[in-house]
Amino acid sequence: MAELGELKHMVMSFRVSELQVLLGFAGRNKSGRKHELLAKALHLLKSSCAPSVQMKIKELYRRRFPRKTLGPSDLSLLSLPPGTSPVGSPGPLAPIPPTLLTPGTLLGPKREVDMHPPLPQPVHPDVTMKPLPFYEVYGELIRPTTLASTSSQRFEEAHFTFALTPQQLQQILTSREVLPGAKCDYTIQVQLRFCLCETSCPQEDYFPPNLFVKVNGKLCPLPGYLPPTKNGAEPKRPSRPINITPLARLSATVPNTIVVNWSSEFGRNYSLSVYLVRQLTAGTLLQKLRAKGIRNPDHSRALIKEKLTADPDSEVATTSLRVSLMCPLGKMRLTVPCRALTCAHLQSFDAALYLQMNEKKPTWTCPVCDKKAPYESLIIDGLFMEILNSCSDCDEIQFMEDGSWCPMKPKKEASEVCPPPGYGLDGLQYSAVQEGIQPESKKRVEVIDLTIESSSDEEDLPPTKKHCPVTSAAIPALPGSKGALTSGHQPSSVLRSPAMGTLGSDFLSSLPLHEYPPAFPLGADIQGLDLFSFLQTESQHYGPSVITSLDEQDTLGHFFQYRGTPSHFLGPLAPTLGSSHRSSTPAPPPGRVSSIVAPGSSLREGHGGPLPSGPSLTGCRSDVISLD
């Protein structure tokens, strides 16, 4: 029970990081707040406290409270008998400093044997930094050194010192480049790098959390923070080498000091190193890539045959493969086609553009398959070099099953440019030219403005005026009907329209008028109707009522200047009305005669002369109807 209480005391002193490590070691869920994690850890301790879990708790506790090394004076204090003072005179016991009370003394003599101090981290671990393509290492100023946590404080601090030899100093000074209007820069630089303290493989740059660096007492600028991926996440900096040449003392006699502050993380140590490097450009790397040579084209042909080989298990067989000769980065024709050895595709990208892109922002990712394509794995494709040299007028090729290729030239389709449609006389003239009118027919046409003194907007080309005498036939009226026109006293009226010029037949025949089918089909019973006769004319504005009695017409006759007959719009309906009235109504009384104007045929058929009908009205003159 005493041992269980001690373990419980250790668990309750853990932070969130220790609780998560303990629960992860035991295979439990390690997500949640601190009180939830603590409850899970205590439940683990009570339910199944295996020896491995107990050892893990003790290990975490030793790391949480590292044992302080005691000096001779501290050991003499602990070896004094109880009740005695350090000077040996009797008196009250002097309190022992809390820092001298190690975890072993707090747990008792039984557990002191089990408590061992953590193994110290090596000062210079066997850490190897991953080489950078744009930097050539000239020398190592500080070997990879461990940034180990030395106390239980949240923030750690470490001090480092390095010095430059006269030869190194001379290399830096001779590489100085001063550009007009810009600050001086050095091609050979003093470079500071951070990484994880791991010896399994070459390490990439990795910044500790909350990193601050001072070089010779001056704060060193670091890369800016990246935008957080989620709310509440701790901002991080992009890990990359730091150029500390502007802050270094360029002297062979005065050393340089570096002070590093960072936040410690449980179970994770970091390493620091300083190098003397020479910065390279994209052009230099391209020359080095060319110096490596061009890959044999047979390798690419073998890859093509492998891709186009028919798979017996697949129902779809690929017989050809299209590849573009345009770079996916710059959308331009390839100059130096290259790809990584780890890429499984044939599509290449331009080496110069790829190196320039990574010089600005080193990602080293293939633009085709988005996989890692480091500089060391880049190769120049010899087959694509042959294709680019032999085919300069195409941007796409097609590979066959045997490894051969053929250019894919774009099909040039003759596209007829349709001019915008013209309106009015311009459109008519343009259509006449397009239809190939003979030169002798292209005479100057007399232009007549149809909008002058015209009241009709629906007619494009008005026909010539013709005088059409209209007659009407009397039909019997209904008994007691009122409002019919009488046949004996119906006065004649003239439909008046403004004077308009007429168009010659030669002009109408020369115009290329097209036949347009009707948008809506008309029935057989209304195809003979003259729809223009239903338009409103002056007689409808100023004349009396269409159907009225003889007495009322005589009474109101002096108020109207013009009197017109309604035959121009009731004519088409007269045959139908007449037949119905004859069959259903008797003859009208002799004292009162009603009639409806009804021509024998449609107005369109009667343009040439009088229409045949029944007896005409007495004292009625022919009406002049204009078809405008």
From Swiss-Prot:
Top enzyme class: transferase
GO molecular function: SUMO transferase activity; zinc ion binding
Domain PINIT: start-end pairs: 115-280
UniProt-annotated location(s): Cytoplasm; Nucleus; Nucleus speckle
InterPro entries according to UniProt: PINIT, PINIT_sf, SAP_dom, SAP_dom_sf, Znf_MIZ, Znf_RING/FYVE/PHD
Chain segments carrying region SUMO1-binding: 450-460
Record's comment on post-translational modification: Sumoylated.
Function: Functions as an E3-type small ubiquitin-like modifier (SUMO) ligase, stabilizing the interaction between UBE2I and the substrate, and as a SUMO-tethering factor. Plays a crucial role as a transcriptional coregulation in various cellular pathways, including the STAT pathway and the steroid hormone signaling pathway. Repressor of STAT3 signaling via inhibiting STAT3 DNA-binding and suppressing cell growth. Repressor of MITF transcriptional activity. Enhances the sumoylation of MTA1 and may participate in its paralog-selective sumoylation.
Record-given protein name: E3 SUMO-protein ligase PIAS3
Species of the source: Mus musculus
Lineage: Eukaryota, Metazoa, Chordata, Craniata, Vertebrata
Name of the gene encoding the protein in the UniProt record: Pias3
